[in-house]
């Protein structure tokens, strides 16, 4: 399983697991992530030159990382980056969906849904117990997508409320 056909999508749409050693895939990965980084939902700033130069190689060096790409013909139009983690409660792997990006002119065509279906398949093959992701509250289109494909807010006990996402920069 490396590629899926797109039956209800554009006949030229194909979704595949990225091969970080493939120059076409590596270039697509950087271009799509840079486009996403410049979007308000991605922070509004381009990737650093360091990230652009080293991203594919650094992901390839991490066996817990995998990415999914969407192509419309020869044009790269979508990306999902994933990092495998570990659920201590389930004592099984989990997969965190770290980035989901579709070029603005290609949104609304369920490309992200198709990519997430392949992420689900790869994650199950890895024995993952669940998928996790974080999304900005104001990114309503993404929230609707994630709910449509089965994601929900995370809580252990309703009395304790939903989990919140925090970060702390180390440099």
Question: Where are the language model's segments positioned?
Answer:
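Acetyl-CoA-dependent GNAT
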Residues: 8-92, 98, 116, 122, ...
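Conserved phosphate-binding and hydrolysis motifs of nucleotide-dependent enzymes
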Residues: 74, 78, 110-112, 150
